[in-house]
Amino acid sequence: MAIERTLSIIKPDAVAKNVIGKIYDRFESAGLKIIASRMAHLSQNEAEQFYGVHKDRPFFKDLVSFMISGPVMIQVLQGEGAIAKNRDLMGATDPKKADKGTIRADFADSIDANAVHGSDAPETAAVEVAFFFPGMNVFNR
């Protein structure tokens, strides 16, 4: 497997529950390195830009409102097969359908307040990482 980078966001619901450290432990225990991180309170414009791919979907407005409702923790994860590994750690989008022991099964409340975001492909990962960490703000470890 190739070494990959992926973007991960710990969403406002999980930040409010004070489980950032528990989620970071899962990343690191799975062999993923956190190579960049920052806390941010997204503006409406930032959330609309980041989730722009969904702008014509019925849930777009609610997604943007949720993502600006409180601070988020944004990180870049690196490791072998990082994209798939992170998606496995996250679990299904709907926490009720997520496998036991996944981040969403353990920390999410609903399909909307589902604790985490993760890139779904190498192409989207590159775009998402560049969106939040432009230039030289990401470091190999």
From Swiss-Prot:
What's the subunit arrangement here? Answer: Homotetramer.
Instruction: Give cofactor(s), names only.
Output: Mg(2+)
**What PROSITE patterns does the record point to?**
NDPK, NDPK_LIKE
Tell me the first and last residues of the signal peptide: none
Q: What is this protein called?
A: Nucleoside diphosphate kinase
Functional description taken from the UniProt entry = Major role in the synthesis of nucleoside triphosphates other than ATP. The ATP gamma phosphate is transferred to the NDP beta phosphate via a ping-pong mechanism, using a phosphorylated active-site intermediate.
EC identifiers of the protein: 2.7.4.6
Name the gene behind this protein: ndk
| A GO BP annotation | CTP biosynthetic process
Q: Which domain of life is it from?
A: Bacteria
